Design a protein with these regions (language model features):
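N-terminal Sec signal peptide and the immediately downstream disordered periplasmic leader
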Residues: 2-83, 114, 148-151, 214-215, ...
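N-terminal periplasmic accessory domains that precede
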Residues: 78-81, 85, 106, 119, ...
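Extracytoplasmic beta-strand/coil segments of soluble accessory domains associated
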Residues: 83-128
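Short acidic/polar hinge/loop motifs at secondary-structure boundaries
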Residues: 123-163
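Transmembrane beta-barrel wall of Gram-negative outer-membrane proteins
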Residues: 188, 201-342, 346-368, 755, ...
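Outer-membrane beta-barrel transmembrane domain signature of Gram-negative proteins
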Residues: 346-357, 376, 380, 386-494, ...
Length: 813
């Protein structure tokens, strides 16, 4: 506790130490995180029902990110742009982790993706179909959030990040905060952005083109279209030294895969599109619609499966049976070398589709306003796996499989009404109904079949298909009513109170509340804070989802790992219970300083307590008796499963930390200026009470220290005439990595980005830049993974492919 207090004092001192350097100059800067795009402003949509609230007079912490800031990061996806600009937000880039390679897990203030609610134009987005099984960290494993990467950045007028609990205002999932993507609402004009880039030494060349157009449709209507196409090649490690592959090649064995370690970044091709349209039916009444469609393909290469012992590595694990060993001491049932003489590296792919459509009618004129809307959303992934085998089928096995599909569908009806009693008091109320459907699509027969060689592993190796026992469609319904009062008690004191009652057909009822306030002590200083409760019902994918995958073990081989349906007969073998909702209690307090022209600083402290937190349990080894019990109930591959996991309400947790954001503009002359931006996040995560069964001291330490407590970025952008130069430093504090039962210390690291741009050609902007300009790679992760060719930590907090350079061109019309 004393260390935490000392860090709070340090951050406070840092915030106010910066103030003297800010001389009276200009209004707050157009720095990273401040919206300045046409059609956008720093008037926020989230966190308040008032129409006139900005980021400085809000009662809670909000970041407003401009599209120019997103482009300046050099990233063409929202995930990485937000990770760069908002230290409290992170998005892991994982290597070869099943579905998590396609929909990346995100966190806000250390909380997982399903504690962060994503909105578009202030309306809830549907969840992704993928449940995060392979994140490699206990705090995020098992989450089922929304996919942040299906919207073209060029479609956005701003991104608003509410860093505060908001379940009482927005419903389940808003425990840690809310992110709102506001779409452009122009009546004319448009732009095109193209980028080509590549990693310094890992390949992964990427081509990206985005376009936006506002189609003129009259003075009383708007119609905006945006689209993006991305083509990203695979990125590979610079030096793959898989011990088995080296030995196989030395022995002259043919057919050894070129990249036995798998790839760092996936192959990725995607088309994304968005529309945003509306027409005024009268002076006050507007009919509006918006939505998106995305289709894409992505693939990752898993590590080498050897045909026999080589270089000290055996073919144990998934191929533990001696029938796969080609040594003369063991009789053969099936000679793997007859199919893959040099072993094989399964290619795991997914065809992704995301669609949403919302139609609404609203009256936003006058003291009484209302909004009625209906939305539909769906997210699907169809899996494929090629270059692999179903060992139990022997020589009759195909080498390509379709393991099945996952689909998340949502339908929601929403009604809201607000009334301004006067300039000081706003009343707001609403009701909502949401239906979620989760569909597990059956795989092709060979992907899950147990063939005639019953002592060999069944199903497609690497990712086993969904059998009829696992497939099905599962529904859940929820109803909510909510209300809020926002009042300026005095000219310097604002108070808002919100409440929400929800009824879930599977998880009962809940009432959440929130109170937020702001005291303006002077024109320069304001205090703000909030207290709230939250609620999150388990997602359908967590209640019904299951999988069978091959995982690296501790000595270079593979084992069969099962994720079991909570409370199912198979999970009950290991003591699993049915799931219950999570509840939370949030507190925040902060200060806003705007006393000097061109200077803005906010400092916010927070604490989030979550009870009955839902996690994917750590993998536990099965016993012979447990495997026999699984086989007795005809669980697929029950006799061969070496590890199991399942979702469970594991423990009570506490997240505590602070955010510091400071911006300043220095005007040097009429055509020269520098914008400075500093953003810092400190975040601690702890268990409250005794750890649950299966959480060893090592796993507890990983939960609490497995991600950096410190994250920050500092940027400076200098503009001189038609040229602009941006430099950015991104800092990750020290953390610890669990490798088996051993902790590998990870030192703090700072990455540097740079970009230079030129706007001397009318309506054209050219820029060249580099991320991670010193080409820093994460450290390795243990001897077993080094022997398997994984020379970098595949769960690194800053990626594994090194530096990236790019060229951008933008045309505005």
């Amino acid at each position: 506790m004393s260390k935490f207090v000392s860090r709070l004092l340090l951050s406070s001192a840092l915030a106010f130490a910066m103030a003297p350097v800010a001389q009276a100059q200009t209004p707050p800067p157009e720095a990273e995180g401040v919206d300045t795009d046409e059609g956008g402003s720093d008037i926020v949509v989230i966190g308040t029902r008032r129409k006139d609230r900005s980021i400085t007079d809000s009662s809670v912490a909000i970041d407003v990110i401009s599209p120019e800031s997103i482009t300046a990061t050099g990233y063409t996806d929202v995930n990485d742009a937000l990770r760069t600009l908002v230290p409290a937000f992170n998005a892991q880039r994982l290597q070869g982790n099943d579905g998590s390679s396609f929909v990346r897990p995100v966190t806000l203030r250390g909380s997982p993706a399903d504690h962060v609610l994503l909105l578009m134009n202030g309306k809830r987005r549907h969840r992704a179909s993928i449940v995060q099984i392979g994140t490699g960290h206990a705090s995020t494993s098992g989450s089922q959030g929304q996919d942040f990467n299906v919207i073209p950045p060029i479609a956005l007028s701003s991104v608003e990040v509410l860093r505060d609990g908001a379940s009482a205002q927005y419903g389940s999932d808003a425990i840690a905060g809310v992110i709102n993507m506001e779409l452009k609402k122009q009546k004319s004009g448009g732009s095109i952005i193209g980028q080509v880039g590549e990693y310094f030494s890992s390949g992964g060349r990427t081509y990206d083109i985005q376009g936006h157009i506002a189609v003129p449709v009259g003075d009383n209507a708007y119609f905006n279209l945006a689209a993006q196409y991305t083509d990203q090649a695979k990125a590979y490690a610079r030096k793959a030294t898989h011990a088995g592959a080296v030995a196989l090649r030395a022995a002259g064995v043919p057919g050894v895969p070129e990249h036995p370690e798998g790839n760092l970044d996936p192959r990725y091709m995607a088309f994304k599109s968005v529309w945003n349209a509306g027409i005024e039916l009268s002076d006050a009444l507007e009919l509006y619609t918006f939505g998106n469609y995305m289709t894409g393909k992505s693939s990752v290469t898993f590590g080498l499966r050897q045909p026999f012992a080589a270089g000290g590595l055996s073919g144990h694990g998934t191929y533990a049976n001696s029938a796969f060993d080609l040594s003369p001491a063991h009789p053969q049932q099936f000679n793997l070398a007859s199919v893959y003489p040099g072993g094989f590296t399964p290619e795991f792919g997914g065809h992704l589709e995301d669609f949403s459509a919302l139609v609404g009618l609203r009256d936003q004129d006058g003291p009484l306003t209302w909004d009625l809307s209906a939305r539909y959303g769906t997210n699907t992934v169809d899996y494929t796996i090629t270059g692999t085998i179903n060992a139990s089928m022997g020589v009759n096995s195909p080498t390509s499989f379709k393991p099945g599909s996952l689909t998340q569908r949502e339908i929601q009806f929403d009604g809201e009404i607000s009334y301004e009693l006067n300039d000081q008091i706003l009343l707001f109320a609403g009701a909502s109904h949401r239906k979620e459907t989760y569909v597990i699509g059956e795989g092709d027969l060979a992907s899950y079949l147990t063939g005639p060689l019953r002592d060999l592993p069944a199903g497609s190796n690497g990712f086993q298909g969904f059998s009829p026992e696992f497939a099905g469609s599962f529904d859940s319904n929820s109803y909510a009513v909510f209300a809020e009062v926002d009042a300026d008690i005095t000219p310097w004191w604002n108070l808002s109170v919100a409440g929400r009652y929800e009824d879930y057909d599977q998880f009962g009822t809940n009432f959440s509340y929130k109170a937020a306030t702001r005291f303006e002590l002077s024109d320069a200083f304001a205090l703000r804070g909030s207290v709230s409760t939250g609620f999150r019902a388990p997602a359908a994918g967590q209640v019904f989802g299951t999988s069978l995958t091959s995982q690296l073990d501790g000595i270079g081989g593979f084992i069969l790992d099962a994720v079991l349906v909570p409370g199912s007969p198979a999970a009950q073998v290991f003591g699993s219970d049915a799931l219950t909702p999570e509840t939370s209690f949030n507190m925040s307090a902060g200060v806003v300083f705007t006393g000097l022209d061109g200077f803005l600083t906010t400092l916010d402290f927070y604490q989030i307590d979550v009870d009955d937190r839902l996690l994917l349990t750590p993998s536990r080894n099965t016993t012979a008796a447990e495997r026999a019990a699984l086989a007795a109930i005809n669980f697929p591959n029950g006799a061969d499963i070496q590890q199991v996991r399942y979702f469970q309400n594991e423990m009570n947790t506490r997240v505590r930390g602070f955010d510091l954001v400071s911006t300043y503009r220095q005007e040097w002359s009429d055509n020269a200026s520098t914008d400075f931006s500093l953003a810092l996040n400190y975040n601690e995560q702890h268990l409250r009470g005794a750890p649950p069964p299966g959480f060893s001291p090592a796993i507890v330490t990983e939960f609490e220290r497995g991600t950096p407590r410190w994250r920050g970025n500092f940027s400076a952008t200098t503009k001189v005439g038609d040229f602009a130069l941006m430099g950015r430093a991104i800092h990750y504090g020290a953390w610890r990595r669990l490798d088996g039962a051993t902790f590998l210390p990870r030192k703090a690291v700072t990455l540097f980005d740079a970009e230079i741009s030129y706007t001397g050609i009318q309506d054209v902007e050219l820029s060249v830049g580099a991320r991670n300009i010193f080409n820093i790679f994460p450290p390795g992760r243990g001897a077993a993974r080094a022997r398997a060719g994984l020379i970098y930590d595949n769960h690194s907090v800053f990626g594994v492919a090194g530096g990236f350079y790019y060229l951008n061109a933008k045309y505005k019309f």
